[in-house]
Structure formats: structure tokens, C-alpha cells
Amino acid sequence: MNIKSIQNLVYEAMNEIKTITVEQAYEKVKDNECNLIDIREINELDNSGRIEGASHIPRGTLEVHLDPNSSIFQKGQLDQNKEFILFCAGGVRSALAVKSLKEMGYEKISHIDGGFAAMSNSSFKIV
């Protein structure tokens, strides 16, 4: 049995996806050019706070929420014409999530290098 490590999975994902800096993400949010999606679990939001204006879709249900054939598809809540920018606590889960959504057919999608940890030391407002 050949089981890949999480480190290998993330490395492979990072070679296939778009990663942006916190500063790039902030400019896109400020200019209303994207959907900012927080994929952390609810307890992480409760413990650390939320980024103002970010939509929350937990990693565990992300693909279901973004499947147009799903009964819980985020119809009307996210602008499908704008880039989707995902973040988690540090960038690992969001990298894997972006890879998964690319495989579903999403094209305008990226994740934030450093995730919430990096965002909390930036111009983003935590509420």
C-alpha cells in the first residue's frame, strides 16, 4: 500500500493551484472583485474571530455547498462571475480545497498564503 503523506498532497496541490498573498487578497476584496470564503470550522471562528465580509463554508461541506446540483448550493449567495478566494487557518486545507474545486470545474479560484494567521496581521478587519 502506497499512502501519500499530507505534506506530499499539499505539495502536489500547490503546484496545480493559484496562491495569492494577503495583500493581493485585500485589494481584490476592497475592489469587490471576489468571493472571500472562510473554510475553517465554526469553533475556529468562535475562538479566533471572523474576517469581516467573508462567507463561511466549512471545509467538510465545501464541495456540497458549491455543487450546482446540490440542494444546499449557495445559489445567489456567491457571485459565480467573480474569483473565489479561500482561506483556512494556515493555508493547508485551503490549498487542498482549491485543488478539489478545480477538479469540479471551478476556474477562477485561489487561496491565501498563510491563511487566517497571516490575515490577522494585515489590513483585514477581524470581527
Question: For the regions a protein language model found, what residue spans apply to each?
Answer:
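Rhodanese-like catalytic fold shared by cysteine-dependent sulfurtransferases
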Residues: 1-34, 42-83, 92-127
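Short, surface-exposed ligand- or partner-binding patches at beta-edge/loop junctions that are enriched
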Residues: 87
